[in-house]
């Protein structure tokens, strides 16, 4: 427990404190403006009845501290130590989701919109964020109906001899074939950028003036084009969810249930609600402290930082977090707790989203708990398996072999815990040996990771035997095992009838499979987990095979690494066009040097290509 004697020598300075258990494990990391005052609030003889006091008194054996010069430094150090120690009672926010943005480089000839994950400082304009690639693609799909910009890389477009199919459905203006002037295309690109920024009134004004000008100059086709654009924009704007405040903001709402906190996030960009996210984590301390810790970790995950962050409750030392976020964003960022008006309404809406997400989660957990209890009964497990892992192998006659691991928590896939393995120690086609390697690597290299309650392997008694052998050899305890054999298909050569056997579940110590009704929920869950492991393994195997087969001709060329290789394929559109390119065309590609271009030509063609003869010379040689 924490005593006054422990903190007697703590300084009244900014810093970070580390609470440790009896075995010297860090169980909580916190920051403070005044270390002595903050840690004293946790002391065991206090009359404070808050929930965090009970757990601290029971578990904390010692407290260490690190002094910093400023509160901002304490904030940064706290985040670093949380990542290093991953304390049990801190928020360990591992976000497997990546935000997506739309990119447009206005300096490019005939600018094009593309979906990207990262936002580098390259002078291009970026719009978003969007919580998923699906959301970004939907926005792009609607934009093309209003602003028919080109869809493909410039090199691909310019290589075309006729307009693409998108032009036929009026979603591309075909600049590659000269069907739109550079000035008119620039107006389209400018309008798309304004629209994505939420400046719909400016877009309408821009195109209305261009429509009127075209009509006055009797360019009736152009006038009709702008008229159609205006109509499409008006229809789309009517469908959009608009909010009363126009500042770009992230709006947070929260819902607290005992030791769990649900946070909802709404993204507002250009006055439009562009998307939202929901987060759930265990938290036994004060709500305000949990929110502050969450914000620090969330924006440390390369999440886009808007100029305004709206939160439902005050947090300690907001100025330090504002300073840190402003430094990361390269612009002033404010954190505010709205008291009235439309901003307060948005925070309330985010809170309502958090409460709804919590209610849906409870309903799912109740259903999952029933399902996992039934699964435990059917497989004779000691308790419902909260964490289930499944492994699969994919290869072609032992070549390019890979393994996969998928993880289901409370009956739902947790993709942040998925893992992929390149098989290193097995050269021949031996699925059993490959499975042994994958399982051994999982429990050797990742021994600190949470153990599963149940491991499912894709296979029957053979693969189950491998799993049991690995668990015994590595002395892994408390982990149950099961094998799920795929349905077998047998065709009678004399008839068209197909006989399918049932899915079979095997457990250690049993020679025969466990009889489960084929439509039962427990079996369907196991099949879903097995199929997900198979999908993940096959997808990875295809990626590996694709890199080996298609990337080999560009690999190993002096001066051409992964970055230049990607740039070449993007510029020319395909490996075939790279091989058809002349030395001069290769030298002119983005990021290429003359020496790298010559090395590539030698690799692709065996010797340097001769320079073309000057005009008027070499006629006799060509006869």
Swiss-Prot record:
One of its GO terms (cellular component) is cytoplasm. InterPro entries: GIY-YIG_endonuc (IPR000305), GIY-YIG_endonuc_sf (IPR035901), GIY-YIG_UvrC_Cho (IPR047296), Hlx-hairpin-Hlx_DNA-bd_motif (IPR003583), RuvA_2-like (IPR010994), UVR_dom (IPR001943), UVR_dom_sf (IPR036876), UvrABC_protein_C (IPR050066). Residues 12-91 form the GIY-YIG domain. GO terms for biological process: nucleotide-excision repair; SOS response. The UvrABC repair system catalyzes the recognition and processing of DNA lesions. UvrC both incises the 5' and 3' sides of the lesion. The N-terminal half is responsible for the 3' incision and the C-terminal half is responsible for the 5' incision. Belongs to the UvrC family. It is found in: Cytoplasm. The keyword Transmembrane does not apply. It holds the Pfam family GIY-YIG. Residues 603-623 are annotated as: Disordered. This is UvrABC system protein C. It comes from Citrifermentans bemidjiense (strain ATCC BAA-1014 / DSM 16622 / JCM 12645 / Bem) (Geobacter bemidjiensis). Its main location: cytoplasm. One of its GO terms (molecular function) is excinuclease ABC activity. Keywords: Cytoplasm, DNA damage, DNA excision, DNA repair, Excision nuclease, SOS response. Interacts with UvrB in an incision complex. Residues 201-236 form the UVR domain.
